[in-house]
């Protein structure tokens, strides 16, 4: 993906970095799939503002699990990782809700 830094300013000095994250309502749901396997589904991250592929990659590394991005806006992780994902996204500045 193309770098969004078009100003030439160092990334840490850009005032808009992370802007709007608290306004995004991210929802985490766990779904039970075939053979009793669980899948953690994260939706509500705006792909126009955030690099969803990068977030998915970081999440997969954080929870040591496989996963994918569906339809360019939904992150699916293998296994039940609700609490780890919630903490990770809240630390990034997102407003997160977990559904049981």
UniProtKB/Swiss-Prot annotation:
HAMAP family: SUI1. Keywords: Protein biosynthesis, Translation regulation. This is Protein translation factor SUI1 homolog. It holds the Pfam family SUI1. Gene3D superfamilies: SUI1-like domain. NCBIfam families: PRK00939.1 (NF002096). GO terms for biological process: formation of translation preinitiation complex; regulation of translation; translation reinitiation. The keyword Protein biosynthesis applies. PROSITE patterns: SUI1. GO terms for molecular function: mRNA binding; translation initiation factor activity. Belongs to the SUI1 family. The lineage of its organism: Archaea, Methanobacteriati, Thermoplasmatota, Thermoplasmata, Thermoplasmatales. The keyword Endoplasmic reticulum does not apply. PANTHER family: DENSITY-REGULATED PROTEIN, DENSITY-REGULATED PROTEIN HOMOLOG. It comes from Thermoplasma volcanium (strain ATCC 51530 / DSM 4299 / JCM 9571 / NBRC 15438 / GSS1). Signal peptide: none annotated.
